[in-house]
From Swiss-Prot:
It comes from the Bacteria. PANTHER family: REGULATORY PROTEIN SSL2874-RELATED (PTHR38449:SF1), REGULATORY PROTEIN TM_1690-RELATED (PTHR38449). Belongs to the RemA family. This is Putative regulatory protein OB1501. It holds the Pfam family RemA-like. InterPro entries: RemA-like. It comes from Oceanobacillus iheyensis (strain DSM 14371 / CIP 107618 / JCM 11309 / KCTC 3954 / HTE831).
Length: 86
């Protein structure tokens, strides 16, 4: 198993193998997911007090908040996959 880490901003990283979804925090269902994760102590806030721009959902039901755009995080995952395929 190859460990690949994705930078989600401010020196924070998430394991690319554990990511299920990267979404925008604007919709009501995502806001509910964040609230439930906070209540269940499964929320990781990696925004450093900045505005949340991406919500990363992992296979362990953890929810990670990032101040980086979802498109940027997605591109980092894709480019990391291409590097690991070589």
């Amino acid at each position: 198993m190859n460990l690949s880490l994705i930078n989600i901003g401010f020196g924070n990283v998430v394991s690319a193998n554990r990511i299920i979804s990267i979404v925008s925090p604007e919709s009501a269902p995502i806001k509910r997911i964040i609230t439930v994760a906070r209540d269940n102590n499964k929320l990781v806030d990696a925004t450093y007090g900045r505005r949340t721009r991406a919500v990363i959902i992992t296979d362990s039901d953890h929810v990670v908040l990032s101040a980086v755009q979802p498109e940027t995080v997605g591109q980092r995952v894709i480019s990391n996959d291409e590097i690991s395929d070589e």
